[in-house]
């Protein structure tokens, strides 16, 4: 069985490095010289678990030698049909001479794992498509799928005694879910991002389009602002024809939404943390590099296992700071704030919304990427991708290049030989000429958000806004108002308050892209939007979300009334109802009654009972952080 390490014998218990041994269930780790089956050895050694071994033989373990010595690698694919992020029949260029149709990336990984002399076990977990559910009741199920994914992967990895895990997510909540699972099971781990979609093109608009175009077009359609360009092919086309054209061509194939929306925000941040292979976040789903990455991941996970690198070894404070820096540089989604807090909470790394604010105060915004810019992830891929950006930031001292990664090398070593950004490219501005001197994500506080709120303000919309409150209890009420055309430019500056959409109140903290995009499409630049819900990574404009405490638990947002004057200031980081003093708030509080729970049973009812607040990541297994 191999030479035993000093101080260890087969079956010895080795502490796995958790901060609190009672936080997560502890498993025996067998440290045997030259063997990588440190957890599966529990059920495959000798004849202690004959039933388990019989089942494994039945599942495909070929012989006794593999049973006793081969490590078990779980391959977790977050997949379902009906979503291009998960599109299954991918035609992938595997080399320069031929194509091969594969069911999914997991099959490539499994085959490559087996080539390394290990046992690959595929399993699946699920999510929902934000773009499909946006604006409807289905969106309430979105955020809680992050917890389902983390719970599912933790369950299978631990119960099946896997020695390592390779996770393959492809959509917004998928990625933080896999990282949270990795922090829980703390076994050798690599994430493979499913990859970005290519941009679409509308002949009637004569420009590139993407999923965000669909939602903004709806606002333009409602306010009679959607028209075809004047070209021979557009003669006689109606606004409805233009909307048809957009819907049919916005998503031309496989991959996650192509701007610097939530999926690409999380993928790039996780690469900056060292938890995926170099280039993973910027390789398009249908690129030949993505298929080759799946093959390389099997080699890399073996190195990770041999070196004994654990997710918590990599998920350091410095790694999270790298993630925050890159998110500010690229103009990433506000959802990143929520997910970074949840990931850090799970890994017991102290991280707060104040850390987000400090990073934003010192890091410039450089990327001309959608939704606020004109380029897409595929464009960044063509000029060097995420590693080229990281190389620039390491050289400038903005990213900590000493953090260890899943390659077994440091981040600086990973990007050292990567091409530098072409000085003539237009996507990433030089540090000397940023789009904005500080980050686009601001943490606001004030009498409407004493525990914090998250604003996405690029500067294009200005840095402060004052308007008259117009209050909506649920997004649907605002959607009805927008559809009726009752939000008008001639009404003056308006601050639209959408409340009771937080983690508990929604429940599920749904994204408000339907509303925010409709406002942009309608050209309503006299409007700011404030909510205790979330925004899609595709949202832009003067938007404030994640308001804490949320309205459903009696937060000040529940006490705002139509006609109150609200000021939002991204320079002082304040959000206040300026004409409502504390005495008036107390009078209103006495009259306020908590709404009945929107849902009592099922997965959303359970979620509403368990979930913590957004300022701590909205996690369900620990409402308050341990620091």
Give residue spans per PLM region:
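Classical protein tyrosine phosphatase
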Residues: 84
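Amphipathic coiled-coil/heptad-repeat helices and related helical stalk/stem segments
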Residues: 149, 175, 512-515
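An acidic, phosphate/nucleotide-engaging active-site surface
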Residues: 149-162, 244
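Acidic, His- and aromatic-enriched active-site or binding-groove loops in soluble protein domains
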Residues: 147-148, 191
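Catalytic or ion-coupling anion/metal-binding cores of large enzyme and transporter domains
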Residues: 2-71, 77-81, 90-95, 105-119, ...
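A short, small-residue-rich loop immediately preceding and capping a beta-strand
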Residues: 156-178, 190-192
């Amino acid at each position: 069985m191999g030479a035993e390490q000093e101080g260890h014998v087969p079956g010895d218990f080795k502490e796995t490095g958790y901060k609190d041994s009672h936080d997560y269930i502890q498993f025996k780790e067998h440290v045997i010289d030259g063997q990588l089956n440190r957890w599966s050895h529990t059920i495959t050694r000798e004849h202690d678990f004959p039933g388990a071994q019989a089942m494994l033989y039945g599942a495909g373990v070929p012989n006794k030698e593999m049973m006793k010595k081969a490590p078990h690698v779980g391959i977790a694919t977050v997949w379902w049909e009906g979503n291009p992020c998960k599109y299954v029949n991918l035609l992938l260029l595997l080399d320069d001479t031929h194509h091969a149709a594969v069911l999914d990336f997991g099959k490539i990984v499994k085959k490559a794992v087996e080539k390394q002399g290990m046992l690959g076990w595929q399993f699946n977990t699920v999510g929902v498509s934000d773009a499909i559910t946006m604006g409807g009741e289905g969106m309430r199920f979105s955020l809680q799928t992050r917890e389902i994914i983390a719970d599912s992967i933790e369950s299978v990895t631990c119960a099946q005694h896997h020695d390592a895990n390779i996770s393959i997510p492809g959509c917004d909540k998928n990625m933080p879910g896999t990282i949270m699972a990795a922090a829980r099971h703390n076994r050798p781990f690599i994430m493979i991002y499913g990859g970005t979609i290519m941009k679409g093109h509308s002949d009637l608009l004569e420009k590139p389009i993407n999923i965000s175009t669909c939602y903004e077009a709806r606002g333009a359609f409602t306010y009679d602002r959607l028209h075809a360009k004047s070209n021979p092919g557009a003669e006689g086309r109606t606004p409805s024809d233009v909307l048809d054209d957009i819907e049919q061509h916005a998503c031309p194939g496989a991959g996650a939404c192509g701007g610097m929306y939530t999926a690409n925000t999380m993928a790039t941040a996780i690469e900056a943390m060292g938890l995926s292979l170099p280039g993973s976040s910027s390789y398009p789903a249908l690129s030949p590099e993505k298929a080759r990455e799946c093959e390389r991941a099997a080699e890399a996970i073996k190195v990770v296992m041999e070196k004994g690198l654990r997710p918590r070894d990599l998920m350091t404070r410095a790694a999270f700071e790298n993630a925050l820096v890159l998110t500010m540089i690229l103009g990433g989604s506000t959802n990143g704030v929520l997910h970074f807090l949840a990931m850090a909470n799970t890994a017991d790394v102290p991280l707060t919304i104040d850390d987000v604010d400090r990073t934003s105060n010192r890091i410039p915004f450089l990327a001309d990427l959608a939704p606020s810019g004109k380029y897409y992830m595929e464009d960044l891929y063509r000029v060097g991708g995420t590693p080229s950006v990281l190389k620039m930031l390491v050289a400038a001292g903005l990213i900590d290049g000493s953090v260890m990664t899943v390659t077994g090398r440091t981040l600086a070593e990973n990007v050292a030989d990567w091409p530098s950004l072409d000085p003539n490219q237009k996507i990433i501005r030089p540090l000397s000429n940023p789009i904005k001197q500080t980050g686009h994500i601001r943490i606001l506080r004030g009498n409407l958000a004493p525990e914090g709120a998250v604003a996405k303000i690029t500067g294009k919309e200005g840095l402060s806004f004052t308007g008259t409150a117009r209050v909506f209890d649920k997004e649907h009420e605002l959607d009805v108002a927008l559809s009726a055309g009752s939000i008008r430019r001639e009404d003056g500056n308006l601050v639209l308050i959408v409340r009771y959409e937080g983690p508990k109140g929604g429940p599920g903290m749904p994204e408000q892209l339907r509303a925010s995009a409709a406002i942009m499409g309608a050209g309503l630049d006299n409007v700011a939007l404030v909510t205790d819900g979330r925004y899609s990574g595709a949202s832009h404009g003067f938007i404030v979300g994640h308001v804490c405490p949320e309205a459903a638990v009696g937060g000040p947002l529940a006490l705002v009334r139509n006609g109150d004057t609200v000021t939002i200031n991204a320079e002082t980081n304040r959000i206040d109802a300026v004409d409502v003093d504390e005495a008036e708030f107390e009078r209103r509080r006495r009259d306020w009654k908590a709404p009945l729970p929107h849902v009592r049973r099922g997965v959303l009812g359970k979620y509403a009972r368990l979930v913590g607040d957004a300022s701590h990541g909205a996690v369900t297994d620990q409402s308050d952080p341990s620091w």
